[in-house]
A protein has these predicted regions:
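Non-transmembrane, interaction-prone segments in cytosolic or luminal domains
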Residues: 29-30, 61, 96
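Small/polar-rich, solvent-exposed N-terminal microdomains that initiate assembly or binding
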Residues: 1-46, 72-79, 84-88, 129-130
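Short beta-strand-to-loop capping motifs
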Residues: 60-64, 120-122
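Short, charged interaction patches at domain edges and termini
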Residues: 1-10, 40-53, 93-130
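Short, conserved charged micro-motifs
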Residues: 65-72
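Conserved beta-strand segments that form the floor/walls of ligand-binding pockets within enzyme
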Residues: 36, 59, 117
Length: 130
């Protein structure tokens, strides 16, 4: 399995521990709040799958009345990502983490949209210090 897919899968597993989570943007029948494991960027430092940096974006959507729940989800995910050390044969360390809280008016009702950008350093088959 590639490092990109490994980290994506582990990230989705962590999201599903917190709430309703998808690996695609669900249609309008999904209940709010929900999490969506989305875009990813892989910076391959060695031109192999041995070492690199992976940026994973996670989206949290909810109604305006879900603000407290969304903030709790974001906090729990931050802690879970910080603790993540392994993903399907790769060792991980979270190296960067940013969030944005956005107003989203694409639905009939106004929504809150949290965008979490998480960077992981990965190595294959060796333990990371830390």
């Amino acid at each position: 399995m590639t490092p990109t897919h490994s980290i994506f899968r582990q990230t989705l597993i962590e999201c599903k521990k917190i709430g309703d989570a998808y690996d695609y943007l669900p249609n309008g029948s999904a209940n709010y709040p929900f999490l969506y494991t989305g875009e990813m960027i892989n910076t391959d430092n060695s031109h192999s799958d041995m070492v690199g940096t992976m940026n994973q974006t996670v989206h949290l959507y909810g109604r305006l009345s879900d603000r407290k729940t969304l903030m709790e989800y974001e906090s729990k995910l931050h802690d879970a990502f910080k603790r993540m050390r392994h993903a399907f044969g790769y060792n991980l360390s979270m190296t960067d983490y940013t969030t944005q809280l956005l107003q989203d008016n694409t639905d009939i009702q106004p929504l809150l949209h949290i965008v979490m950008d998480v960077s992981f350093m990965y190595t294959k088959g060796e333990q990371l210090n830390g």
